[in-house]
Amino acid sequence: MEKPGKVQTLSILILINGILNVLWGGGLFIAVVLGTFFVGLLCTPVLLLPMALGVVEIIHGINLISDPPKVAKPSRALAIFEMCGILFGNLISLVVGVIYLVFSNDGEVKGYFESLPIE
């Protein structure tokens, strides 16, 4: 079965959002640490969360864009974590998370993932 356009769109959106999350997290980290004269290093665990999410998104996007996908089904947890990106001021991540949930619940996308051979 040929990969639906929505699956391709999802994989590209996740890749772009992952790259943006890594850049956003790094920029936020640098701004807080330098803006507080290194006192912001205490906030490091919280500031690194967007970067960690970005790395997971990049890996998931690469696995989803491959043919055949190395993903058994779309990750609902990843979409929820993307929507939680609004806590760090990342509106793009919120939009991508909502689009991911809507597209992954589409009948065509569900049918495509169900038709994939189980490894």
Question: Where are the predicted features?
Answer:
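Flexible interhelical turns and helix-capping residues at alpha-helix boundaries
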Residues: 2, 38, 87-91, 102
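Hydrophobic membrane-targeting signal helices
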Residues: 28-30, 48, 60, 64, ...
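Individual transmembrane alpha-helices with interfacial aromatic-anchor signatures
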Residues: 45-46, 80-91
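Short, aromatic-rich membrane-interface segments at the entry and exit
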Residues: 49, 92-97
